[in-house]
Amino acid sequence: ATTAFARAKGLGGHTGGPYDIVPETLIVDSLREGGTKIHDEFFDEAGHRSALQYVRGVVRGKMDSEKLLHYREYGSGLAGHPEPELLDCIDFSTGRLGHAAGHVNGVAFANPDSAIIMYGSDGAQMEGNNAEAARLAVANNLNVKWIIDDNNVTIAGHPENYMAGFDVGNTLEGQGFKVFTCDGENYTELYDCITKSLEINGPVAVICKRVMGPGIPE
């Protein structure tokens, strides 16, 4: 609904991405609240999914729900990419797509006793920065968990059509990550993969295969 209001006003915005990663966000937040040692900041390498962070801010009592009606409006603070200096509910500004993993590694170096969660995407994983960050995480056994929305959709189309042979899981496995793959809309599978990742001290990727915006008519 938040993204729909913006579109109706001609402000644009993204619906599929933030809608996709609601299940894994709820699972991680619940595990953290239940006492699992997960760093409390929210890192999303796909900043255009900012709508979810704003909704999460409301749920966590850090923002009034009325503000959601002004998503992407100038001066509202609810920018298309999240900016922490504009809203208290935003932990981290990820910049453009695919540029968060290196920063997340830094957080992992500074917080070795907690798991550091990064929400990723198949599109972001095509960026070269991620390859460098993955190798650094493996070399230092950083306790990072990349939960990746793999919906086979990017702004350029479907990766399976224009980048033959590219596979997120195989790529990360080749770089040394432990990889779990699940149906992102099978919540039992998703929960199991996330909890397994948290039992491992070191870099793990959970690849969530799904259709973008499940249940939303095209």
Language model features with spans:
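Cofactor-binding active-site loop characterized by glycine-rich and histidine/acidic residues
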Residues: 3-4, 8-140
